[in-house]
Amino acid sequence: SEMCIRDRIYFIDNDDYFARKAILRDADESYFEDNDERAIFFARGVLETVKKLRWTPTVVHCHDWFSGIVPIYLKKVFADDPIFKEVKIVVSLYGDGFDKPLNAGMKEKIANEGVKDKKLSILDTPSYENLCRYVMEYADGIILASDAVNPEVAELARNSGKPLLEYQSPDAEDFFDNYNRFYDSIQ
């Protein structure tokens, strides 16, 4: 007999933030002014959904800057929640940086979400580099998931003292094995 496998997919939605057709940039390739708020909403929404569904993750893998608020919430807002108490956080960095800093009020918006953290001062200027630096503070492991990662960010990752997986070509024969070994090393 054939086993029926079903995957469930959940969407975090908000008409104010996600009703537009473009994801991060407008038609002129400018970043939306509310990208910081959208990232904050997304992070909170994902974690509240995980709690509501009573999932207990072993590893939370965040991909690039837009999900970068998740590690901060896990370590500062949800740290005492039994669902997240033992979770390990992996952050993958890509070449998707932005030239202009996000909204200058981002630091205060994160603080208003219940994040009490002296390291928030890193986001006095919420540039791509500073956001990555802040996110890496709360990661248990870092992956350079692109050969086009910002060189400054890649160097910060290498000097972080955290377990690091350097860029792996998806065509490499040992691609999946290297990722599996990396996950095993942080658990």
Please give the residue ranges for each predicted region:
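Membrane-proximal helix-turn-helix segments that form the acceptor-binding/catalytic region
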Residues: 84, 97, 112-141
